[in-house]
Amino acid sequence: MESTPFSGVANQIHTLCERPTYGEVKDGALDVKRQHKCPGPTSGPSPGTNLSGCIRMNDDPSMEENGVERVCPESLLQSREYSSLPLPRHTSSTDGTITSSDPGLEILNMASCDLDRNSLCKKEEDTRSASPTIEAQGTSPAHDNIAFQDSTSKDKTILNLEAKEEPETIEEHKKEHASGDSVVSPLPVTTVKSVNLRQSENTSANEKEVEAEFLRLSLGFKCDWFTLEKRVKLEERSRDLAEENLKKEITNCLKLLESLTPLCEDDNQAQEIIKKLEKSIKFLSQCAARVASRAEMLGAINQESRVSKAVEVMIQHVENLKRMYAKEHAELEELKQVLLQNERSFNPLEDDDDCQIKKRSASLNSKPSSLRRVTIASLPRNIGNAGMVAGMENNDRFSRRSSSWRILGSKQSEHRPSLPRFISTYSWADAEEEKCELKTKDDSEPSGEETVERTRKPSLSEKKNNPSKWDVSSVYDTIASWATNLKSSIRKANKALWLSIAFIVLFAALMSFLTGQLFQKSVDAAPTQQEDSWTSLEHILWPFTRLRHNGPPPV
């Protein structure tokens, strides 16, 4: 709603024209109870107003009628001062549409005061004529009329003086408001800056709010994309229709002016006016095109301001994502470095294991005197080492992972399965033995044999107590290795020599069997019966097939 320059004045006239209500009459005296509402602007009471003067009650029974007549000008004076003084301040705080320096405002104020005064006087005359029983003590009607005329003359002089003093007070108020505006003008700028800073701090502080705003804006843009083309076409069509209608109206106006020119040929002034109208209409068409272009530019700028706010939120969200990516990338690089260090720490252990196996084989070949004892003790170790080679890589991987978790200081999760341990205790004993052998190379051979026996006994006992799955496969591997070694040795040796030796062994066995049968002595009283060849063969081979107890019989 646009405020007109006379809206505030009309409100003041309405409030000033409210009539007071009079009370009852008692004991032949005039008992007046006046309740007057304090007039003022709609914006609220201004400081400095005295509310006690707005409501007055006269309870004195000996009050004269002049008291009633004097209440009206006093209240009018107060309302006049109240309406004239705070009005410029109120109007200056707004957009300046209402100013008290207009001459029409002064005329309306004076007219309102005269109307109030006349209405109150007429009301008093009506009350006096309607109540003949009301008489003032010690006064007469003539005296009342004289007093009433005196009061009205005094009111007129006071109003004239106020009308003269009003321009001076208005100019003073204008100066005060001009100085006040010059002082107060820089304050809104600072408040706007502080609000913008607070908003920027809030958006940068909370990343979740930025992300939520980003999601909301992205969803809004995606929804607008579906209807964007239709809306553009619709707006273009409405713009074209408006321009066409405007052009039609302008052409109609020009046609009317052309039809009006032959009617006003004799009048030169009318001809000049018609020419001016034609020029103004042409200028109006140009102004309409300019207004349309400016309106489009203004709409584009407003849309750009809205989009810039959305883009600012999106940029903030992208910066947060970049910061998060940089942080996670740094953590990933640190984890990679830790894993590389763990792998480097485990590589020397693998090299040590290979060296220990080679040195063990060399030491066994270089000790012919203790060959039997060492081979017996080394059989399970070789079996274990042969089985361990296939599973060492998996064990190293599991151990590396567990050690990396320990170094990082994080606990393994409960859902993570426990790492299987494929390495038995005697393998660690072998590693310790090899370390001792490296340290004590110059020691004597018996001391080395004793260490071998000591390590062999717990390894065998642990093997019996804790049988593992890979023992069978390791035994099979050792047997296969022995067979391959035997084949290779046979291939290397002379085949004729081996064949001759085998033939001699078989011939000796056959001869021993035949001599045992031919030179066997017969025993007296032995049963003689004819048996088949299979029974005689069983009888011959019974010492080898029957069980024999070499020990004494049980008691």
From Swiss-Prot:
Among InterPro entries, the record links this protein to:
MRVI1 (IPR008677)
Q: Which residues carry this modification: Phosphoserine?
A: S363, S370, S424
Residue spans, topological domain Cytoplasmic: 1-495
Keyword Chaperone found? no
Query: What membrane topology does this protein have?
Result: Single-pass type IV membrane protein
Report the gene name: IRAG2
Which residues does the annotated region (Disordered) include?
84-103, 128-147, 437-469
What processes does the entry annotate via GO biological process terms?
A: immune system process; nucleus organization; single fertilization; vesicle fusion; vesicle targeting
Annotated protein name in UniProt: Inositol 1,4,5-triphosphate receptor associated 2
